[in-house]
Amino acid sequence: MTTACLLIMVATILPEEPRPSETYAAQEYAAWTAKLTGAPALEIRRDDRLGDDGFRLQNAGGKLVVSGGRRGVLYGVYESLERFAGIEFLSVNTTVVPEKGALVLPEALDETQQPAFELREPLWYDAMNNPDFAARLKINAAQLEERHGGCSHVFDTVLRNCHTFGRLLPQEEYFEKHPEYYSEWNGKRRRGRTQLCLTNPDVLKIVTQKVFERIEANPKAKYFGVAQDDWGFYCTCTNCAAVDAEEESHAGALVRFVNAVAEEVEKKYPGKVVETLAYQWSRKPPKKTRVRKNVMPCLCSIECEFKNPLVRSKHSQNISFLADLRGWAAQTDQLYIWDYTTDYANFLYPFPNVYALQDNIRTFRDNKAKSLFAQGAHQGRHADFAELKTWLISKWMWNPDQPIKPLLQRFFQGYYGAAAPVVRKYFDELHALPRPEEGIGTLNIYESLYSPMMPNAFLEKASAMWDEAERLVKDDPIRSYNVRMGRLTVDTTRLQRHVDAESRWPEYQALARRCLNAFEEVGDIKFSEVEGLDELTLSDWRRIATNSFEAVSADLTLAVSPKSPILAIDRFFFRRGEKYKLRAHVRGGGFSAGVDDWDSVLNHGKRTFSSDEVEDDWRWYDILEWNVEPCAYFWFSGEELSSEVDYVQLKRVE
């Protein structure tokens, strides 16, 4: 939101032969202060001693002087607009400019700021897809353009920051003649989901040469990923197992391998850095071997519990992760953190992690992490409090000591306007919901849609709160939009849970239409990382919006993503207590399928088909007959990458 006011001209002094970012900083200052009633003149001074991101702010006789490096001058301008004029850059569509405001400098202003992290990348949709907005949040990641001062850490476009083994040694090129290049698992060299044999000297030669080729092809890049692929199956051959045993970690063979690549890179291309993952099976640092100075290990928090801060958590994975964090911090001055900040099973599911974010970012800073990548719902807009989390994470990546209460007050008031107290009440009650610190119900990044920690009674109450919030901003177009999109987390969860659907069918039809309208209005909302899940869900909602309960519940044949090794389907409106026949249309590989229950460990039945039983052509396979129970869901798990499913059918037995 912007407020129209008198256009004013501000005198600006730039360095001789200004950089694009210096010119852009002056343009941004002029554009935003034009919406104010007054602002001092601006002088931009180049000072590369402050690094690319650091800046200094001074009041020089009533003139604002911003000194800094490539990005620092721009960040200094935005800092001044926020602190001294009260302008709030809250989201791509919401900027608050105080009515009749002015930019007033403190008389004794003279301060220098440096960021807590060299690389700051909150991977959320607004920040990832709008470089102007990213720069206003002092984000310095890949999407920044020359006028923003460019990106701080340039990764290769092929050997990026994760999962590059398959690119370095493609199986279709090498496996047939050299299966020994790949992981030995259960006594056999594994195809499909596999890793590399990291003690094989030929693998080292090939990978090193491939890295050389990428450096030659992309000389502007500084960082080149040599990183495990996104599954287990580390090599257990005699040599790899011996190294891992000696190092007391499966990162042992990995770090020795990456060090060997990096040693050759340093000889030929000094200044280039090899990045690798400390992820899942490689998370624990090796006992004996330290990473080289030109290796950047990226420690990933994927297994953690995210409601409670790491330093106060009693969760076993958080305790072990903190130990690993300290171990890697003792090994390197280039520690890179990959943190997780949303629910990847369902971006629109309420995910109350905000009060852990600041403490965790501070913990990373205190343990010498230099780079922070916070993966969020980057695939689509309006995930659970997406705009708030993007803004807060960005603030704390710059300075994790900023207190949370004033930040929350600023954001809620600016983003939700008159509805701020009601939305804040919902936010507080959501985060106050009790959760265990261990076991079923902990807040992990694949939170169940049916988690007992998110009671239906709370969702009903939350829906009423959002109704009230909508009423309060009905005459404010921007805040009305923000509230309507904010309530999607509650609306979609209620619709997907469909409690008492048959008796409340008109209500669910209206809810389906509301959700469909929101998706149509925005166009780039996503449910999760699962391919095909968006269209699957929207198709289901269209049937709900336009059909009777009888029609929807009778025949539930549904197309799904053809390539889906693991799949759970719980989005149906069943007739409770009636019997359905389940079957799946599959080809190519072995699979298991059955029915489980979200609310308990109860298994309603399953069936497994071996690869020998599954034909290469599409065929229907009967799974079981199922008496529908509340909170039950159908699941399908392909045992091999070749296993494909394109239809699941749940047909009521007459």
Please provide the spans of the model-predicted regions:
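Feature activates predominantly on carbohydrate-active enzymes
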Residues: I8-V10, P20, A25-E28, W32, ...
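Short, well-ordered secondary-structure micro-motifs within conserved domains or adaptor modules
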Residues: G38-N59, V65
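Structured mid-domain segments that build the active-site/substrate or prosthetic-cofactor binding neighborhood
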Residues: D202-K205, E213, S316-P421, K425
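Substrate-binding cleft/loops of secretory-pathway carbohydrate-active enzymes
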Residues: E275-E303, Y349-N353, R381-T390
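Catalytic domains of carbohydrate-active enzymes that cleave complex glycans
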Residues: K368, I393-R576, R619, D646
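Extracellular polysaccharide-targeting segments
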Residues: I525-F527, Y621-E629, W635-E654
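Beta-strand acidic-aromatic groove motif in beta-rich domains, primarily in extracellular
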Residues: G588-S600, F634
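Extracellular carbohydrate recognition and processing domains
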Residues: S600-C631, E640
